[in-house]
Amino acid sequence: MSCGGGDDEGSEITNPCISDQIFSQSRGDCNVSLSFETIYNENITENSRIISSNSIPNHIVGLFGRVQGALNPNPISEQNLVYTLPISPVSAKSLIPLLGENGPNYSFGIMLNGVELDPVAAEPFPHEGRNSPNANWEWNLEATNTPLGLDCNNGHVQPSGKYHYHGPPISYLDNLDLSLDRMNLIGYAADGFPIYYKYAFSDPFDETSSIIEMTTSYRLKTGIRPGDGISAPCDEYNGVYVNDYEYINELGTLDEANGREGVTPEYPNGTYYYIITEEFPGIPRYFRGIPSDDFNFRE
């Protein structure tokens, strides 16, 4: 990327800075059936929900591994994972971001099929690698809007062989045959709060109220990024970077963590809960509670 040039006095102002990052929501085909059996177990103790998983999805996936046409070179392999979550999570004093000053700190949570929700890419500007001394994590690529080798489920594979979702897990959700007239529990966040898909009560504290689609309070910024194309990206806001979006309080039905307080079928006395939405952020980027270290990349 580069910026340069100027405007003659009285001429129309133009944007001389062009980004080389392409907006793309293309996905790889899902036509691979895995030979592994999906393992997901929960053990409830007095204070904890202990989940064990092998991270193998219970649906078809894209082609991964060192074969022609693969979406990335990492083959899917079984994992041996254990997560300990609080049964009665509490809110932190302030929201805790998944992305830290030096890169991703946490994955967000786990689906009821044992696959992690891991929305944050490790792709900081100027795209020289996460360990580059020039890495600007304020401008990190949005995985669902850039060609990072995701399959039709918004998933791909880490070098360890762990399959994970960067966006709404399409095939998993389709296979659930979800009801449109009730709230559907689909997983748990790293802080222990439940995750639901898309729909919730119109009155958050009235379980007899109608079910409606939840809406995010994020929107795409307008105008041109302030960067020079060298230390920070330039060109128009288009969703390629997470920072292309802004949170507007009460723009939608959900808060900055893409959740809200209310009653649910599983929590009739009320709880905080997250919603997976179709629109950005899709998978939340903040925790309302204190995340388990089992989801911490730096532990």
Q: Which sequence ranges carry the predicted segments?
A:
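Short, flexible domain-boundary/linker segments around small modular repeats
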Residues: 112-153, 228-260
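C-terminal motif of bacterial Sec signal peptides marking the signal peptidase cleavage site
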Residues: 1-2
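Extracellular/lumenal glycan-associated surfaces
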Residues: 112-115, 159-172, 267-281
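Extracellular structured ligand-interaction cores
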Residues: 80-82, 105-107, 150, 160-164, ...
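A mature extracytoplasmic/lumenal domain signature
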Residues: 89, 121-123, 167-169, 199-201, ...
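Extended, compositionally biased non-globular segments
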Residues: 191-193, 197-299
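Solvent-exposed N-terminal domain segments of exported/luminal and surface proteins
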Residues: 6-147
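Aromatic- and glycine-enriched beta-alpha-beta binding-site module
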Residues: 138, 143-175
